[in-house]
């Protein structure tokens, strides 16, 4: 709504005054959008009767003989304020009001304290004065006493202590209030005391409450005896008034009352200490402190500093020393984000903004700064953030420090708790991983290939595939890969360390007999019904990074066939390696001169060597005479089994090069022609023929 006629003001920027619509969206360079802007809904829904300057005048909060208190809204910030409207015509009729009307503004310009209301702006029109103050949303303390009948002692202690702190600040500044009463005590949103009305004692009842104190409300009911006697007085008159307020909080009544009302009778009752009875539920310390405040003799009455040091007043406030608040804002305490926003975005002169804030002079500039700063603090408090993440002002470092004043401690505590929680979670994950590894580790230790010879059955061996857990136990390598017995009770693992042998678990699958008629041929041996054909399945594993180390399907052509049972292997040196079956052997026969004979064949169509390539006349053929003589005569030859550990074995690079040689394969001979001759052997012992390994090592 437009401003009423005659209610214009020239303090604010021109764009706040001209036009029907106030600015809605302000710049967001220095402040968050929710702080610098005002929603249209807020302006539209605020009920008001008129506009004066940058303020919308709303509902009435209280009313007195010549003044009214109304709720207002600042259109530039969207913040609510309290506006005291004083009628000029009625005020001129009262000489005391006319004399001291400007005194309140001068006093509040000198005073700055958290328990004293801040005067923000003063407007004057043809018919009225407008005093703009911060709005105390907690209401009046008188209203709280009406609702509860009285206030509990612990809560009254808090209010009295805050009131004494505010009065002590006034006395240090040389200001005596002289009109301290329940009606002048307001509560903010945090339930803290706010002291109002300086120099306008006759306006004590502007909030319009009708209460039991109405017959004796005002200065006489709260005034000290020296004031009623019109004697010289000092700051201790405020100490007496504090005692009356304390009595009213604890009991809901006044300490001195007379019927009918008479100033002479009231004064006499004060001098005689004829106080109304106190409730029995009050503590002796509270009663003693109350009586000391209501001492009629000013010389015996404590001053404000002595009252502040009382034991009852400081109960539950140990370690909280008296904090002195400066009456002026220091330059380093300024909110630089708000100052820069006002100077660069709202059109205020930077030097004027600084001077007004430091001098605490009530005007529109101070009101804009105060309201924006309060809005910013509430935003940071609600968001629980130590700093503004978006639209941070980088021109001055002071604003960076001020954002951490409220939430630095809470942020550090929350961060330390998060770090501790993360550390506990990581430890739990590590423990779970260790337990998982411990559960998975026995799987490769108790595999079939590592079972001792005594546990291997004498029948045909059944093909077995490794499970997924076994394949992953060595990073993708099969647990059957190049593991051999080195000494009794130990085995060599792929990690080149000795692991103690454990007896297999009863549930560990054992090698079963293979019943595949297509992959095996029946062999007639004259060794009794207990001797049967035994097949040992060996997995081909080439240690190549380009080939996945997976368990291949075993075929009849890819196996060693060892004749004779049981099989006995002599222990080998730890430096020996079991080579992967690369070469193809056929047409092998027992070597003369060896009593213990064992024949084996290895069929692999994928081998690069063909059966014909291994001719008896070749130097690598097991039937070569030179080979036989060398084996039988020279035991130090690397081809000899007994001296194999003394010579270097074939490396994996040589094996791969031999495997990759391109040899034109020839047609294979029938299986019957490649079958070795069967020889009867002792059932209790079988060994390898050393000549069969010639050329392989």
Curated annotation (Swiss-Prot):
- Lineage: superkingdom: Eukaryota
Q: Which sequence ranges are marked TM in the entry?
A: none
Q: Which InterPro entries match?
A: Kinase-like_dom_sf, Prot_kinase_dom, Protein_kinase_ATP_BS, Ser/Thr_kinase_AS
User: Which keywords fit this entry according to its UniProt record?
Assistant: ATP-binding, Kinase, Nucleotide-binding, Serine/threonine-protein kinase, Transferase
Q: What Gene3D superfamilies does its record include?
A: Transferase(Phosphotransferase) domain 1
Q: Where is the Protein kinase domain?
A: 55-313
Annotated catalysed reactions: L-seryl-[protein] + ATP = O-phospho-L-seryl-[protein] + ADP + H(+); L-threonyl-[protein] + ATP = O-phospho-L-threonyl-[protein] + ADP + H(+)
- Pfam families listed in its UniProt record: Pkinase
> What does the record give as EC number?
2.7.11.1
Name the residue ranges with Basic and acidic residues bias: 405-424, 460-473
Q: Which GO terms describe its molecular function?
A: ATP binding; protein serine kinase activity; protein serine/threonine kinase activity
What PANTHER family does this protein map onto?
HORMONALLY UP-REGULATED NEU TUMOR-ASSOCIATED KINASE, MAP/MICROTUBULE AFFINITY-REGULATING KINASE
Name the record gives this protein: Hormonally up-regulated neu tumor-associated kinase homolog
Question: Lineage from the top down?
Answer: Eukaryota, Metazoa, Chordata, Craniata, Vertebrata
């Amino acid at each position: 709504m437009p401003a009423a006629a005659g209610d214009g003001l020239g303090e604010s920027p021109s764009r706040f005054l001209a036009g029907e619509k106030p600015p809605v969206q302000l710049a967001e360079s220095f402040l968050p959008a929710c702080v610098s802007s005002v929603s249209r809904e807020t302006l539209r829904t605020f009920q008001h009767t008129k506009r004066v300057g940058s303020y919308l005048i709303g509902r009435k909060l209280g009313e007195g003989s010549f003044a009214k208190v109304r709720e207002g809204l600042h259109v530039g910030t969207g913040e609510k304020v309290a506006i005291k409207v004083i009628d000029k015509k009625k005020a001129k009729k009262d000489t005391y009001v006319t004399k001291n009307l400007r005194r309140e503004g001068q006093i509040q310009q000198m005073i700055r304290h958290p328990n004293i209301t801040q005067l923000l702006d003063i407007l004057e029109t043809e018919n009225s004065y407008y005093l703009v103050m911060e709005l105390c949303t907690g209401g009046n303390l008188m209203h709280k006493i009406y609702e509860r009948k009285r206030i509990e002692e612990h809560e009254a202690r808090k209010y009295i202590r805050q009131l004494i702190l505010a009065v002590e600040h006034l006395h240090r500044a040389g200001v005596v209030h002289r009109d301290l009463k329940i009606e002048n005590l307001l509560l903010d949103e945090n339930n803290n005391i706010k002291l109002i009305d300086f120099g306008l004692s006759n306006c004590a009842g502007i909030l319009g409450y009708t209460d039991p104190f109405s017959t004796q409300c005002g200065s006489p009911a709260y005034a000290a005896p020296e004031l009623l006697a019109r004697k010289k007085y000092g700051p201790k008159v405020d100490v007496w008034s504090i005692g009356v307020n304390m009595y009213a909080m604890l009991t809901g009544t006044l300490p001195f009352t007379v019927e009918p009302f008479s100033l002479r009778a009231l004064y006499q009752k004060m001098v005689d200490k004829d106080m109304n009875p106190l409730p029995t539920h009050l503590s002796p310390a509270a009663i003693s402190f109350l009586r000391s405040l209501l001492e009629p003799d000013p010389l015996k009455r404590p001053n404000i500093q002595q009252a502040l040091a009382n034991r009852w007043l400081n109960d539950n406030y140990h370690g909280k020393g008296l904090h002195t608040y400066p009456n002026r804002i220091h330059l380093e305490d300024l909110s630089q984000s708000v100052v820069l926003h006002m100077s660069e975005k709202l059109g205020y002169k930077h030097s004027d903004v600084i001077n007004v804030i430091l001098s605490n002079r009530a005007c529109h500039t101070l009101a804009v700064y105060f309201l924006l700063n309060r809005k910013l603090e509430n935003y940071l408090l609600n968001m629980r953030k130590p700093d503004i993440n978006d639209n941070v002002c980088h021109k001055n470092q002071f604003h960076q420090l001020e954002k951490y004043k409220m939430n630095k401690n809470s942020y550090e505590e929350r961060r330390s708790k998060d770090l501790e929680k993360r550390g506990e979670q990581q430890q739990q994950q590590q423990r779970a991983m260790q337990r998982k590894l411990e559960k998975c580790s026995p799987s490769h230790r108790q595999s079939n290939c590592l079972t001792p010879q005594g546990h291997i059955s004498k029948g045909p061996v059944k093909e077995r595939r490794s499970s997924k857990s076994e394949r992953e136990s060595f990073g993708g390598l099969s647990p059957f890969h190049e593991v051999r017995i080195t000494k009794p009770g130990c085995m060599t693992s792929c990690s080149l360390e000795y692991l103690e042998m454990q007896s297999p678990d009863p549930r560990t699958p054992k090698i079963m007999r293979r019943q595949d008629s297509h992959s095996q041929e029946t062999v007639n041996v004259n060794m009794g019904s207990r001797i049967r054909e035994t097949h040992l399945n060996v997995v081909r594993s080439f240690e190549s990074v380009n080939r996945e180390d997976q368990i291949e399907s075993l075929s009849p052509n890819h196996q060693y066939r060892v004749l004779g049972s049981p099989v006995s292997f002599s222990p080998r040196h730890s430096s020996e390696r079991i080579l992967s079956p690369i070469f193809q052997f056929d047409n092998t026969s027992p070597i003369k001169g060896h009593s213990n004979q064992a024949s084996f064949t290895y069929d692999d169509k994928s081998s690069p060597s063909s059966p014909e390539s291994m001719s008896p006349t070749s130097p690598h053929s097991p039937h070569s005479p030179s080979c036989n003589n060398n084996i039988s005569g020279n035991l130090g030859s690397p081809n000899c089994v007994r001296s194999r550990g003394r010579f270097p074995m074939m490396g994996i690079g040589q094996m791969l090069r031999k495997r990759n040689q391109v040899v034109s394969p020839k047609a294979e001979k029938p299986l019957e022609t490649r079958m070795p001759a069967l020889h009867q052997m002792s059932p209790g012992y079988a060994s390898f023929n050393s000549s069969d390994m010639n050329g392989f090592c």
